[in-house]
Amino acid sequence: MNSTTSPYRVIAVCTGNICRSPMAELMLSAAFAEAGLADAVIVDSAGTTAYEAGRPIDPRAARKLTAHNLFSDRHIAREWQSEWFTERHLILALDVDHYGWLRASAPDEESLSRIRMLRSFDPDLEDGDPLEQGIEDPWYGGHADFDAVWDQVQAAVPGIVRYVQDAIAQDARVADRNGAGTVAAPAR
């Protein structure tokens, strides 16, 4: 990427934006930084509902993240905004209901092409049915449920990083050919 290229935007989406999606956001942000892409990729998160909007991350999620030196003290839950369909390059649904909601809400085919189940990047599930790729809401459970979310997201992180690296490289080649300086939606 060159200095005139816009960052690649990734968003993780769950229900209330206080457990799964902020965990994924921080885990992915750390992975992109470790891959040398901190300035090239912006990761954020949102919920499909406004139930938790304005609230901090669930303390159990925060504890799990802190145990891995990821700090969520600045996170404030927010609801999905429809303009993000065009402003995000990769939209990661954390569970099947989020995937269905996002697909039903998408305004066009290009937006639909940006929506993926987060766990579709897990090599053990990548060829599976999206209905089998969900991450259950840990909110109703205990610490073991937050451990499971961590493990499930972590299994997909390397695949997401590779996917974004490939998309950035492809977009840089297109931009170089066209003399442009923006990141396009990833080719499918």
Where are each of the predicted segments found?
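Conserved active-site segments centered on acidic
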Residues: N2-E87, Q165-A172, N178-A184, R188
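Helix N-cap/beta->alpha junction signal
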Residues: S21, D95-V96
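Phosphate-binding/catalytic loops
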Residues: L90, V96-R188
